[in-house]
Design a protein with these regions (language model features):
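Noncatalytic modules at the cell exterior or secretory-pathway interfaces
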Residues: 438-455
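Blade-level signature of beta-propeller repeat domains, shared across WD40, Kelch, NHL, RCC1
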Residues: 311-373
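Entry beta-strands of beta-propeller and related beta-repeat scaffolds
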Residues: 19-22, 65-70, 103-109, 159-167, ...
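Short glycine/acidic-enriched loop and turn motifs that connect beta-strands
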Residues: 27-31, 76, 115-116, 171-174, ...
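Repeated scaffold domains used in trafficking and secretory/extracellular systems
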Residues: 5-11, 52-66, 89-106, 134-162, ...
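Beta-propeller blade signature
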Residues: 35-42, 119, 179-194, 235-239, ...
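Beta-propeller domains
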Residues: 18-55, 72-86, 120-124, 130-132, ...
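Loop/turn-rich, solvent-exposed surfaces of beta-rich toroidal or solenoidal domains
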Residues: 223-225, 233, 246-292, 386-389
Length: 566
């Protein structure tokens, strides 16, 4: 899937009316773009719908009463008829769709990434504005109010228990690209009128419940919201009108950033198995469909991944992941040791078709999370619960800044039923490292202090066993190793619909049918300019050396490499 924008992410992937429907998005396009609505047949024929108007959409919901799919600005019935709400009538980057609080049989809500909120009549597609979209727009004359909700870069939207829940995961400001501890994001509610009401000032993404893409069937059903801060992932549970926090470890820190730009749209979705599948910070999560305050056990990592996933669904026996693969614009990815012209010439992304069992066979799960991170604590303070189960190996580090030893009490919720018992007590002078035994079990762990504590940190390191063996998988057979005698080298670059390669002075192109042809020399310059500069990476007899921001970093180097060889 291609567009003419700086990025081509996958906003939504939904099986509907015997087909798979997919939308892509460009970066910050509140009034439309070159992106498309795709209809994919069971035989994997890709149909680009002529109704496409693009934008930056990632919202999707199946409206049961009218038997329609809302995906982006499009409404699709069972006969695959597509109707469109133009951005002139509903401006903004559509990020979430939810069931209506007052008239769910005939209306739904659509929220935007700049905190806008609309009601849409599913029959005539008329629109009513409740909260104005934050993008400048002098032409649109809606009746909504201007929000005062902090944060920006909206993500999830869901309704239940008489409330609409909205999440954003970003912040504006000069520090957001450098300091991940910057206060950022918001989890908010709306009760049918007025402005968003702040629930928690952290970065949040997915908001959903047991009803998934259809919305909750019972208005008493819970809502789950997934987010993070500098310490860990954050899972919020709304049950019986009250919020309950939980913390999970991060599988990767690559998705961090107070700006919120690195996550795309994490999801918790049904995939035809007992448990739901969650994606967040590089981990595939097993998420119990009946997760609640008294039934919170069972969240567990399945594996770690390196993709950036926007949405996914089960279709024709496989899990289809819509990814954000190759952007023409480099955004924040500017480094002195990489080419300034190495990005693909045209943004593109693909669908990743995966057998369900493969999800458990990817990268070994790792997790890192804190309940306190250089925090000053009050006497009697109790941490939020942190995941304690699901990993083969678990370790905890405690540090504090008091002059005298501090007592930390560990409490465990063994069954996930909300009943806490003391697991162990530690007297910590300055720091402590504790490796948990296999006999120390439970769903959740929390800590308690009896006195004031300065600069307290409690951090968890988790990992699974790596069962992959020492050898590389067969997918790497075509890559030259240190001992390969017959090899070739060159520079490759994504060049619109082909892969271009410059090797040995000759220029080649590889198409989507894996046909390699020698091309005209005119394409060689495009590839050559993408070559990696050598000025910031060097080697000596001890190691490889990378220079960045005035500092030098040494990286281990195999002794088989000759430091004098290029």
């Amino acid at each position: 899937m291609y567009n003419e924008e700086g990025e081509c992410g996958t906003g939504a992937v939904v099986p509907w009316a015997g087909r798979l429907w997919v939308i892509t998005y460009g970066p910050h396009k509140p009034m439309g773009s070159s992106d498309k609505l795709y209809e994919i047949t069971p035989g994997l024929k890709q149909i680009i719908r002529p109704e496409s108007i693009g934008g930056t959409p990632a919202n999707r919901m199946i409206h049961k009463e009218s038997n329609q799919l809302n995906i982006g600005p499009y409404f699709i019935d069972q006969k695959r008829k597509v109707r469109v709400i133009p951005y002139a009538s509903m401006p903004g980057r559509h990020t979430g769709t939810a069931r209506h609080l007052k008239d769910p049989a005939n209306k739904l809500y659509v929220a935007t990434m700049e905190e806008g909120l609309y009601s849409v009549d599913v029959h005539d597609l008329s629109v009513v504005e409740h909260v104005k979209d934050g993008n400048p727009n002098k032409k649109y004359r809606g009746q909504g109010i201007k929000t005062k909700l902090p944060g920006y870069h909206g993500k999830g939207l869901y309704s239940s228990q008489g409330t609409l829940v909205y999440a954003n995961n970003g912040e504006r400001g000069k520090n957001v690209t450098k300091d991940p501890t910057t206060t950022s994001g918001a989890l908010a509610t709306w009760q049918g009128s007025g402005d968003w009401k702040l629930v928690r000032r952290n970065q949040f993404t997915e908001v959903t419940g047991p009803g998934g893409i259809y919305g909750n069937a019972d208005d008493k059903d819970p809502i789950w919201a997934m987010g993070w801060d500098a310490r860990s992932l954050i899972l919020m549970l709304l049950e019986n009108g009250k919020w309950h926090p939980y913390r999970l470890p991060k599988g990767s820190h690559s998705y961090d950033g107070a700006h919120g730009w690195n996550t795309e749209w994490p999801r918790i979705r049904e995939i035809g198995q007992k448990d739901l599948l969650g994606t967040m910070h590089g981990t595939f999560w097993r998420f119990p469909e009946a997760f609640s305050k008294t039934n919170s056990a069972g969240i567990a990592p399945r594996s770690n991944y390196l993709k950036v996933i926007g949405d996914f669904a089960r279709w024709k026996g496989r899990i289809v992941f819509g990814c954000d693969d190759s952007a023409q614009k480099e955004f924040l990815n500017h480094r002195p040791f990489k080419s300034t012209k190495g990005a693909p010439l045209q943004s593109n992304s693909n669908l990743w078709f995966v057998e369900a069992e493969k999800i458990d066979q990817l990268g070994p799960a790792i997790g890192r999370g804190s309940v306190w991170l250089r925090d000053d604590l009050e006497a009697g303070q109790v941490s939020e619960p942190h995941l304690f189960s699901g990993y083969d190996h678990r370790m905890m580090v405690i540090r504090h800044g008091n002059r005298k030893p501090v007592a930390f009490t560990l409490e465990v919720d063994k069954k996930g039923d909300g009943k806490w018992k003391v697991l162990q007590k530690f007297k910590v002078e300055n720091s402590l490292v504790h490796i948990f035994r296999d006999t120390e079990k439970g769903a959740w762990l929390r800590l308690r202090v009896a006195e004031k504590v300065k600069q307290a940190t409690v951090h968890f390191h988790y990992r699974d066993k790596d069962l992959r063996g020492k050898g590389n998988g067969p997918i790497f057979d075509g890559v030259a190793t240190l001992g390969t005698k017959a090899s070739s080298k060159g520079v490759i670059r994504s060049n619109r619909k082909v892969l271009s390669m410059l090797a040995g002075g000759a220029y080649y192109e590889l198409n989507d049918r894996l046909e390699l042809t020698r091309g005209a020399k005119s394409g060689a310059a495009l590839v050559a300019e993408g070559a990696q500069p050598k000025t910031k990476i060097r080697v000596d007899t001890a190691s490889a050396i990378v220079e960045e921001d005035g500092s030098s970093y040494r990286i281990p180097m195999s002794p088989g490499y000759d430091a004098q060889d290029e």
